[in-house]
Regions:
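Extended, helix-rich architectural segments
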Residues: 1-141
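Extended, regular secondary-structure scaffolds
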Residues: 130-221
C-alpha cells in the first residue's frame, strides 16, 4: 500500500563530455527513463486524471461496504494555478515590422497559444515539460511541446549543465519502439525492431544547438501538487471510510431477543441486544 503512494524524485540524466552516444548508451538511458515513467510520471498523471492509489487497494470482503471516493485536489490545484498564470495568452511583439510579422506567422502556424498552455499545465503536473523545434515538410520552423513521459534531455556534467542530447520515442501498434536522438547538429532515427539500432546516418536538423528547451515548475522539478500528495491520499481514504461507516450502519438490522411484552405490547425487559 505504501509503495503505491510514494512518488519517486525526478532525475536529471547526464553524460560526460568524453563519452559518445552509441546504441548501448542510448538503450541504458531509455531504460532509466522508462523506470522513471513508472515510479514518477505515471503516478502524477494518474493523480491529475483522478486515478489515485485507493483505487488499487485490495478489495474488502463482499459483505462490507467498499467505497472508493476520489476528491481530485491535484486537478484543482493545477487548473486553478494555470488559469491565473496563463489564462491570458502570452503576447510577443517587436518594434521591427519584419520581425513582428515573422513572429505572428510562427505563432499562428504552430498554435503557440495552445502549446504554451500545455507546457504550463505539464510543468504543473510533472514538474517540467519540453518544447521541441524542427523543420516541417514545408521547410518552415515547427514547434511542439513534449511531455516528459515521451522524451528526455541528457545534459553534460559541467558546473552549469548544458543539453547534449534530446531523445523522443514511442511504440507503434505492434509494440515496436521508434524514436529520434538529436545532438547540437544532427538528428538520428532509431528503432528496436530486430534489436536496438540506428537507422541511417542521421541528418542536419538546421538549428544552432540541441533543438529543445526545458521548462521547469521549480528548481527541484516538483509537481505543483506533489507536496500535498500524501494529504490528498489521506483525505480520500478518510472520506471513503466515513462513507463505509454510514453504509454499514444504514444496512444494519436491530434484533431483540427475549423481550418481555405486556398486554399492551410495551417491552418490559430485554435479555439480549444483537446487531
Amino acid at each position: 500500500m505504501k509503495t503505491l503512494e510514494v512518488i519517486a524524485k525526478d532525475e536529471i540524466f547526464t553524460i560526460s563530455d568524453d563519452e559518445t552516444m552509441d546504441i548501448k548508451h542510448l538503450n541504458k538511458y531509455i531504460s532509466k527513463h522508462q523506470q522513471l515513467n513508472g515510479s514518477r510520471y505515471k503516478k502524477l498523471k494518474d493523480g491529475y486524471e483522478g486515478f489515485y492509489p485507493i483505487m488499487m487497494y485490495q478489495d474488502k470482503p463482499q459483505y462490507k461496504p467498499d467505497n472508493r471516493i476520489i476528491v481530485n485536489f491535484a486537478k484543482y490545484i493545477v487548473d486553478t494555478f494555470n488559469g491565473f498564470f496563463i489564462g491570458i495568452p502570452i503576447k510577443v511583439s517587436s518594434t521591427d515590422e519584419e520581425v513582428a510579422t515573422y513572429i505572428n506567422e510562427l505563432d499562428k502556424r504552430n498554435h503557440q497559444d495552445d502549446n504554451n498552455a500545455e507546457i504550463s499545465k505539464n510543468c504543473s503536473i510533472y514538474g517540467k515539460c519540453y518544447e521541441m523545434y524542427f523543420i516541417n515538410e514545408d521547410a518552415k520552423v515547427g514547434i511542439r511541446y513534449i511531455e516528459p513521459t515521451k522524451g528526455f534531455i541528457i545534459y553534460d556534467d559541467s558546473i552549469v549543465p548544458e543539453p547534449r542530447f534530446f531523445v523522443t520515442y514511442y511504440y507503434d501498434s505492434n509494440s515496436i519502439m521508434h524514436g529520434y536522438l538529436s545532438d547540437d547538429s544532427y538528428v538520428y532515427e532509431f528503432s528496436n525492431k530486430s534489436g536496438m539500432h540506428f537507422i541511417g546516418e542521421g541528418s542536419l536538423h538546421g538549428f544552432d544547438g540541441v533543438p529543445v528547451t526545458e521548462y521547469v515548475e521549480n528548481a527541484e522539478r516538483m509537481s505543483a501538487f506533489e507536496s500535498t500528495w500524501s494529504m490528498i491520499n489521506a483525505y480520500n481514504k478518510a472520506i471513503s471510510e466515513k462513507a463505509n461507516d454510514v453504509d454499514y450502519f444504514a444496512d444494519a438490522y436491530l434484533k431483540i431477543i427475549g423481550a418481555k411484552v405486556d398486554k399492551d405490547g410495551i417491552i418490559q425487559g430485554i435479555d439480549v441486544y444483537t446487531l
